[in-house]
Regions:
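Short, well-ordered beta-strand segments
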Residues: 1-5, 53, 77, 100, ...
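Central regulatory/effector-binding core of bacterial HTH transcription factors
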Residues: 1-62, 132
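Beta-alpha-beta core module
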Residues: 61-68, 72, 136-185
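Flexible hinge/capping segments at coil-to-helix
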Residues: 61-100, 104, 191
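Hydrophobic hinge/microswitch elements
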Residues: 37-42, 46-50, 55-56, 111-113, ...
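A late-sequence structural motif
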Residues: 10, 14, 53, 168-205
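Short secondary-structure boundary segments
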Residues: 57-58, 80, 105, 153-155
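Secondary-structure junction motif
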Residues: 98-120, 189-193, 197
Length: 205
């Protein structure tokens, strides 16, 4: 049995797919994935309620260790047929576009805040219409034509392939984030957990 926790970003996009593929290769293994906020995942790993955690922000905690797991590309998602679709746009163009943002504290939001600050742009300079708590909600808003959003590429891969969402690049921004693996300090890892980490790293590189 493998009990693993993930924050809402990777927990709603990458991890279900990787865990399902791992389970197909190891049909005798029962896998339980719980999805919650980063702090709760870290605390559960520290208390050894979960064997592993996967989070988008490494927050210091003396009961756990963080290690790089994979890089998550953040892109600007736009509705099909949008004027930004499949091209590079300037920050000035972005300022005039209705924007859907992840709520404050979300990993993707922090990445975008940092990138914009480095480019000399403040969020209040943009036309923010909605702030949402889940990447799935932001994806739905784009699908509904309510605006554009910065989102993990992995959250919209299927939509891009289906042609329902397109991707744009923003000149001067190269947003990505490190997704971290969380382990409990001093805990001997099971063979199943070791096998999963090895499989996931090879799958996500």
């Amino acid at each position: 049995r493998l009990e693993i926790g993930a924050s809402t970003g990777p927990g709603g996009t990458v991890m279900p797919v990787v865990l399902a593929e791992f389970q197909q290769r190891h049909p005798g293994v029962h896998i339980a994935l719980s999805v919650s906020d980063t702090q709760r995942v870290v605390e559960q790993v520290a208390r050894r309620e979960l064997e592993l955690g996967v989070v988008g922000a490494a927050r210091r905690h003396r009961g756990v260790v963080f290690e790089p797991f994979f890089r998550d590309e953040v892109v600007l998602a736009v509705p099909r047929g949008h004027g930004f679709a499949d091209r590079s746009v300037t920050l000035d163009e972005l300022k005039d576009e209705p924007l859907v943002l992840m709520q404050e504290g979300a990993g993707v939001r922090q990445v975008i805040d940092d990138e914009l600050r480095e480019a000399g742009v403040r969020l209040r300079d943009l036309d923010v219409r909605l702030e949402l708590g889940l990447q799935e909600s932001a994806r739905s808003a784009v699908l509904g034509g309510f605006g554009v959003t910065f989102i993990s590429r992995s959250a919209i891969d299927a939509d891009v392939e289906a042609g329902t969402i397109a991707v744009a690049r923003v000149d001067g921004l190269e947003p990505s984030r490190e997704i971290s693996l969380v382990r409990s300090v001093g805990r001997a890892e099971t063979r199943v957990a070791q096998a999963f980490v090895e499989f996931a790293k090879s799958r996500l590189q």
